[in-house]
Amino acid sequence: MKSRKELEIALSQVPKFRNPKAELEQHVTPADLAATILWTAHLAGEIEGKIIADFGCGTGIFCRGAELLGAEECICIDVDMDALDDGKAFLSRSDVTQADILTCPLRSIDVVFMNPPFGTVRRGIDKEFLTTALAKAKLSVYSIHLASEATERLFRSIALEYGFNTETVVTLYRMPIEYPWHRKRIHYMPVQVFKFKKSAQVISRT
């Protein structure tokens, strides 16, 4: 991949959810947003040669991008086998696993990418995803969340407890949320993208 735009074009081929499940708060990560996040990590040296995981991966857009950017290994985890089956054809080197990331045992991971449930159906699930990712990642976590000052304050505080500093990768993005049974086919929700980076002091002690 020579550019973020080239990566975006490649990621646009990753399938969407055929039958999105509202109870899982499944929302597609748009190719342009995924490319921005992945390219940011790539420029920081956090993909090539690294072990990457996508928590709640859906059809696997982050793992597909990580493959293209030279990750050593990609782990694609989701509870929804339908979504995993849809994405398998586009994943050449990823370990695709049906599991609940909140309870499944995980080995060493360098960087986690995720577009987790926002917590509108199951309150607090976004926080559970984040704490799980922070507990597993050796270097960084890139995560998409609803844009909210209160949420940002909470997540920055949680990150510090785990020894991570917080950076904003994308300040505001209007993410399309599409469910076939909605009267209005596409809704837009404001989201932010955070990078939680383990502090150098913590890394040096591990």
Language-model features: where?
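S-adenosylmethionine
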Residues: 101-192
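Conserved S-adenosyl-L-methionine
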Residues: 56
